[in-house]
């Protein structure tokens, strides 16, 4: 037990230690200050600026930035959809896999362009190497870069600067942050045992009978794996994601993945502190998601260590670790930490089956998806956190009779409406409406578990899509037959069609509506004239205000989603307790 807790503590300490250094580096990149990569990147970026037609790095308004995001993402999505749809006749397809069904192709394209990487397919039987490398790999960089660019634009606006230029921010995010770290990380993963090959499946004799053979899937995994984690993408090369020994063979690779997942979203808060020239406030704000993250990790780890008490009572033991759905090489501690990390950061990669988590883990992972700020998605998570902070400023100002201001700029009706729209409307609608429809029509469901856990499966699917996370409780009939099976006569199902199309709604609504609202909010803040601080100004860089902000986050999250949590993991926990009695 002690060893498991030490593993968790050391991982968190590593993340906390690198946050200020990486956060300061990202600030230098986007404030266009000198970095070590300038001699190489300046030339490459100049060529790319010329190619995309960026002249003079002109600043964009909120609407211009939003349109640039939408147009570029739409073009990329069309290209990738065409590539996957034509993979049967394209190169790098050693197993001759034909194109997937149109709804699987559509869902996959939208899922990866929104940085969700929700997968209703098995990578080794559905996509060619070309689709994985040229299509999904390309989207992993551009979707992560898009989120990071939006987060930086929001920080600029919040601190009174112009929003910047989307194309410049996207290119700098890729060339100076995502690509260099991915190159180094991929080399480290290859050295640690992650394969990187264009050869087809390995045909080997089985252990039981040397006269029989088996096909072992492999491929260019290492370079795919590192951007999967660093960009908070989460989509696996194989069906079992990072539980697969080729994606995550040992404890060292697992640690690299955890650090990669957490590095950008945690450091971006410190980046804000550099932009605002207020590192004290950044450190205090950092404590909010860090505290919630540690709390959820402890809750999940305790549940997995104690196991299912109903099963334990039948076995006649007081405690037995819940090893269902877990890899023995990672154990209960790393599985719990990874589950909380991947849902807190909207990465979505998994090393254990979330469907097999105890109710503690189900509560923690669902809560992360509902809140979206522990530490949140690539760039957008930090922006969501500050949207909560703006609401906290407004509420606190009304309570104490002081002018609601943030960084010397008044918080007025427009800011409150946009922040409330983000938190109280878009996310719940994208989750609860399709969830209600799925539960109301049995033909759509394909749910493997009745009762409370089945409800959690359905809501988790849409919460994961709306939060751009991509992980799943699974247990749903959301996968069409593999392309080779369809070619052999298997029929696509209406259940999988429903899940693919309804999840697309949640993916798009949960990605682009919040991005537009965040950019408009930031644009409005950037245009406000700063007001000199007076004795009536509410200070936002104090421990008291930080505590109030944490309270606002928990209260708003509880008010919106507590009924779902009560009918899902909380009710499931009481059900297990009743079985013991």
Curated annotation (Swiss-Prot):
Which molecular function terms from Gene Ontology are attached? P-type potassium transmembrane transporter activity; potassium ion binding
Instruction: Report if keyword Transferase is assigned.
Output: no
- Does Cell membrane count among this protein's keywords? yes
Q: What is its main location?
A: membrane
Any matching Pfam family: KdpA
Which keywords fit this entry according to its UniProt record?
A: Cell inner membrane, Cell membrane, Ion transport, Membrane, Potassium, Potassium transport, Transmembrane, Transmembrane helix, Transport
Q: Where in the cell is it found?
A: Cell inner membrane
Q: Where are the transmembrane segments?
A: 2-22, 74-94, 135-155, 177-197, 255-275, 284-304, 332-352, 357-377, 381-401, 421-441, 501-521, 550-570
Membrane-related topology note: Multi-pass membrane protein
Q: Which GO terms describe its cellular component?
A: plasma membrane
- Subunit structure comment from the entry: The system is composed of three essential subunits: KdpA, KdpB and KdpC.
UniProt xrefs under NCBIfam families: kdpA (TIGR00680)
Similarity-based family: Belongs to the KdpA family.
Q: What does this protein do?
A: Part of the high-affinity ATP-driven potassium transport (or Kdp) system, which catalyzes the hydrolysis of ATP coupled with the electrogenic transport of potassium into the cytoplasm. This subunit binds the periplasmic potassium ions and delivers the ions to the membrane domain of KdpB through an intramembrane tunnel.
Name by which UniProt lists this protein: Potassium-transporting ATPase potassium-binding subunit
């Amino acid at each position: 037990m002690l060893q498991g807790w030490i593993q968790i503590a050391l991982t968190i300490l590593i993340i906390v230690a690198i946050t200020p250094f990486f956060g300061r580096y990202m600030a230098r990149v986007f404030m266009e200050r000198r970095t070590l990569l300038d001699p190489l990147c300046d030339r490459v970026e100049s060529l790319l600026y010329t190619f995309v037609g960026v002249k003079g790095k002109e600043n964009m308004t909120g609407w211009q930035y939003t349109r640039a995001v939408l147009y570029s993402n739409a073009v990329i999505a069309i290209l990738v959809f065409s590539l996957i749809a034509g993979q049967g006749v394209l190169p790098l397809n050693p197993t001759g896999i034909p194109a997937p069904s149109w709804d699987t192709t559509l869902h996959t394209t939208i899922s990866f362009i929104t940085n969700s990487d929700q997968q209703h397919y098995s990578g080794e039987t559905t996509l060619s190497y070309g689709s994985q490398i040229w299509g999904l790999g390309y989207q992993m960089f551009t979707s992560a870069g898009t989120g990071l660019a939006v987060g930086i634009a929001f920080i600029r606006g919040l601190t009174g600067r112009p929003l910047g230029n989307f194309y410049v921010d996207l290119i700098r995010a890729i060339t100076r942050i995502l690509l260099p770290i991915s190159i180094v990380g991929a080399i480290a993963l290859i050295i640690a045992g992650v394969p990187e090959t264009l050869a087809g499946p390995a045909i080997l004799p089985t252990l039981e009978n040397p006269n029989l053979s088996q096909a072992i899937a492999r491929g260019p995994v290492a370079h795919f794996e590192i951007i999967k984690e660093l960009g908070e993408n989460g989509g696996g090369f194989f069906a079992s994601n990072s539980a697969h020994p080729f994606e995550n063979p040992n404890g060292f690779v697992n640690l690299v993945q955890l650090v990669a997942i957490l590095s950008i979203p945690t450091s971006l808060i410190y980046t804000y502190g550099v932009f605002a020239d207020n590192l004290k406030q950044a450190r205090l704000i950092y404590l909010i998601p860090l505290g919630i993250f540690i709390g959820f990790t402890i809750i999940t780890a305790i549940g997995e260590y104690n196991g299912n008490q109903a099963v334990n009572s039948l076995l006649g033991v007081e405690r037995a670790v819940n090893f269902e759905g877990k890899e023995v090489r990672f154990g209960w501690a790393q599985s719990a930490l990874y589950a909380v990390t991947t849902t807190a950061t909207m990465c979505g990669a998994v090393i254990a089956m979330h469907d097999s988590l105890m109710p503690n883990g189900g509560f923690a992972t669902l809560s992360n998806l509902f809140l979206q700020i522990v530490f949140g998605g690539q760039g957008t998570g930090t922006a969501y956190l500050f949207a909560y902070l703006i609401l906290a400023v407004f509420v606190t100002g009304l309570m104490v009779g002081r002018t609601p201001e943030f960084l010397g700029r008044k918080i007025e009706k427009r800011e409150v409406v946009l922040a409330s729209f983000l938190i109280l409307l878009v996310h719940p609608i994208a989750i609860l409406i399709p969830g209600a429809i799925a539960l109301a029509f049995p033909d759509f469901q394909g749910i493997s578990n009745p009762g409370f856990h089945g409800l959690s499966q359905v809501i988790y699917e849409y919460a994961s899509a709306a939060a751009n996370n991509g992980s799943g409780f699974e247990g749903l009939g959301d996968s069409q037959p593999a392309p080779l099976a369809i070619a052999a006569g298997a029929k696509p199902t209406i259940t999988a069609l429903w899940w693919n199309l309804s999840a697309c709604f949640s993916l798009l609504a949960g990605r682009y509506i919040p991005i537009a609202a965040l950019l408009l909010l930031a644009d409005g803040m950037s245009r406000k004239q700063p007001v000199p601080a007076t004795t009536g100004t509410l200070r936002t860089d104090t421990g008291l205000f930080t505590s109030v902000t944490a309270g606002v986050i928990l209260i708003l999250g509880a008010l919106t989603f507590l009924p779902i949590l009560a009918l899902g993991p909380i009710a499931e926990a009481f059900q297990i307790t009743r079985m013991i009695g």
